[in-house]
Amino acid sequence: MAEELRIKNGDKQEMYETLLPQIASLVGNETDLIANMANIAAALKQTFGFFWVGFYRVIDNQLVLAPFQGPIACTRIKYGKGVCGTAWKEARTIIVPDVDAFPGHIACSSASRSEIVVPVISVSYTHLR
């Protein structure tokens, strides 16, 4: 079943507070991880107009591109490399206001100027970006 997001323009905090329960409802009855990642990425992109939003999955000890919204992205990222690999290694959110100032930044797109990487960790998987 298709869903329609209902987000009023406001400050980011209000928009997140409105969006989160809608995402929970959207993915609540779906058991397929890939389908849920696809809808979460689409909801974030649609609501906030981010340049790129998406996920990477850990497969064979590297990050492999998963559902995303935005321009073409790097397909594989090594553990501890770039912003995503570093966030995975350190198991923490990393906010990079200027990607040119991040040591070892991987330029998947020259148009990307900043990044926020949030590791999403479950019992058997780590999903990023």
Q: Locations of the language-model features?
A:
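Residue-level recognition of short loop/turn positions
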Residues: E90, V123-S124
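A short, aliphatic-rich beta-strand micro-motif
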Residues: S114-S122
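Short coil/loop residues immediately preceding or within conserved phosphate-binding loops
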Residues: F50, S112-E115
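Intrinsically disordered, low-complexity terminal regulatory regions
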Residues: M1-A66
